[in-house]
Design a protein with these regions (language model features):
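Active-site core of glycosidic bond-cleaving carbohydrate-active enzymes
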Residues: 22-53, 114, 187, 194, ...
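Helix-terminus loop motifs that line ligand-binding clefts
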Residues: 2-14, 40-114, 120, 127-131, ...
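Flexible loop/turn segments at secondary-structure boundaries
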Residues: 14-16, 52-53, 78-79, 121-122, ...
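Short, histidine-centered active-site or binding-site loop motifs used for metal coordination
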Residues: 12, 28, 163
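Acidic/histidine-rich catalytic neighborhood
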Residues: 89, 143-216
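A structural signal for alpha-helical segments
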Residues: 17, 124-132, 170-173, 177, ...
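Solvent-exposed loop and edge beta-strand segments that line ligand/cofactor-binding
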Residues: 14-24, 95-109, 166-179, 273-287, ...
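Conserved functional hotspot residues or short segments at active or partner-binding sites
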Residues: 137
Length: 333
């Protein structure tokens, strides 16, 4: 419990699945318990992520971004991204099977910061913030600040080519969960920059020095964050239906009856009948995505719209991940 050099593997102690790597599972699904019941363990988990800043900065740089881009799969604190890029071979074509989560499933960066802020709000642990928290928030916001794309024809910033929580949909634009969580990460950074400038001048000076080494400044970052937040596209509920699009073009996807797959005794049975490319073109999700967003940020729409989105997306979710039903159950309450 006291060793902040390691996190919690996705399968915990139940098996060797995922090689013991830490995913967003830690901050989003495991962390809330520790935050309330054993806050000292919650802090240790966040310290693990702080120690992983080296690897997160390394990943950002390797992908052409600034700041800290947390790995989708994390192992030792200095390793950076450890998600395998090739996971096997297509037995029909002989082509390698590519795993894109380590490259374009990027919401984990803001998931970590969301958990960090929840911890601070619940515990008031100022020592943690002074030692680690402010730096983590600012460095991850620098990533998002460099990640946003200005789309001239839409007159807004967007986040294109990602995987959201629903991993059956790859290379999507403006995944609602990703965009909202990135916006929150940026908002918190602008807030804490103002805070440390006024109240934590030593920390402000430390971070300013770090920015200057990168050829920028906290003032410039704060200004850019405030500007980009106002122009970042946040998908809104449809005026007629109240449904938030999971990503651009979601409502144009094919609809099929998923009941036979939802009621199967094992997961993944949809792939007995359809290829991954087929499922990519269907309103068929692996796990909570919009419902995950409504769980994390329940105030982004009205209770009536929230209920409509729950009904709409649950019918289109296969719950092929063990992370899905718990979130649906909580949100239903």
């Amino acid at each position: 419990k006291e060793d902040n050099r390691v996190g919690i593997g996705a399968k915990a102690l139940s098996g060797e699945g995922y090689k013991g790597h830490s995913f967003w599972d830690t901050e989003t699904f495991i962390f809330p318990y520790f935050q309330m019941a054993e806050p000292e363990v919650a802090r240790t988990l966040l310290e693990f992520r702080y120690k992983g800043l080296y690897g997160a900065r390394k990943k950002a740089k390797e992908n052409g971004y600034k700041g800290a881009m947390y790995p989708w799969e994390a192992a030792w604190i200095s390793d950076g991204e450890v998600t395998p890029y090739i996971t096997g071979v297509n037995v029909h074509t002989g082509e390698p099977l590519i795993c894109l989560t380590g490259v374009i499933e990027q919401h984990i960066t803001s998931d970590i910061i969301f958990a960090l802020w929840q911890y601070y709000t619940a515990t008031g642990d100022q020592d943690f913030m002074d030692r680690y928290g402010y730096e983590m928030i600012i460095e991850t916001a620098r990533f998002w600040n460099s990640r946003l794309e200005w789309i001239e024809e839409n007159n807004r910033y967007e986040i294109r080519d990602v995987i959201g929580p629903d991993e059956y949909k790859e290379h999507v634009d403006n995944n609602a969960y990703t965009n909202y969580m990135a916006h929150e990460n940026m908002r918190l950074a602008a807030q804490v920059i103002a805070c440390i400038r006024d109240e934590k001048k030593d920390i402000y000076g430390k971070m300013q020095k770090l920015m200057q080494e990168e050829g920028t400044s906290l003032e410039q970052l704060e200004e850019e964050l405030k500007d980009k937040m106002k122009k970042l596209y946040l998908p809104q509920p449809d005026e007629k239906t109240g449904i938030i699009p999971q990503f651009d073009g979601y409502f144009d996807l094919k609809e099929i009856d998923l009941s036979v797959y939802k009621n199967a005794s094992v997961v993944g049975t949809i792939f007995h009948d359809y290829s991954g490319e087929d499922v990519q073109k269907m309103q068929a999700g692996k796990q909570a995505d919009i419902v995950e967003l409504l769980y994390q940020m329940e105030d982004i729409t009205t209770p009536d719209n929230k209920a409509k989105n729950y009904v709409y997306y649950e019918a289109r979710t296969l719950h092929d991940s063990s992370l899905s039903k718990a979130i649906h159950s909580i949100t239903a309450c």
